[in-house]
Amino acid sequence: MSRDFSREKRLLTPRHFKAVFDSPTGKVPGKNLLLLARNNDLDHPRLGLVIGKKSVKLSVERNRLKRLMRESFRQHQDSLVGWDIVIVARKGLGDVENPELIQYFGKLWKRLARSRPIPEEKSEPAGVDSPDA
């Protein structure tokens, strides 16, 4: 899988965001943000960011956060295959320094990857064609 952040790896329409907000299958709360995720049945993850003026006042800070989130997502996307992810920023996130944020996002991605339900293996009943028969 390429480690780019092309258009296909972004949530673009309000419908995509609404689907994640309405029925998230994974939820990782953090101190200053909330990470919501939903299975997307694709071979790549998609990311959407919600950083409002109420939670982070200065546009410089909002843009810095978006840049760091996208870069962290790009680096960890191999472990996030099949998720639509929305990150919702909360108050105080803009006050956190870059190195701390990078480490924080790394931990959140790992927590999200661990929260994925493990698919059950399909066992075939012992029949005529099975080696147990």
UniProtKB/Swiss-Prot annotation:
Keywords: Endonuclease, Hydrolase, Nuclease, RNA-binding, tRNA processing. It is an enzyme of class 3 (hydrolase). Pfam families: Ribonuclease_P. One of its GO terms (biological process) is tRNA 5'-leader removal. The keyword Membrane does not apply. Its EC number is 3.1.26.5. It catalyses: Endonucleolytic cleavage of RNA, removing 5'-extranucleotides from tRNA precursor. InterPro entries: Ribosomal_Su5_D2-typ_SF, Ribsml_uS5_D2-typ_fold_subgr, RNase_P. GO terms for cellular component: ribonuclease P complex. Consists of a catalytic RNA component (M1 or rnpB) and a protein subunit. RNaseP catalyzes the removal of the 5'-leader sequence from pre-tRNA to produce the mature 5'-terminus. It can also cleave other RNA substrates such as 4.5S RNA. The protein component plays an auxiliary but essential role in vivo by binding to the 5'-leader sequence and broadening the substrate specificity of the ribozyme. Belongs to the RnpA family. This is Ribonuclease P protein component. The gene is rnpA.
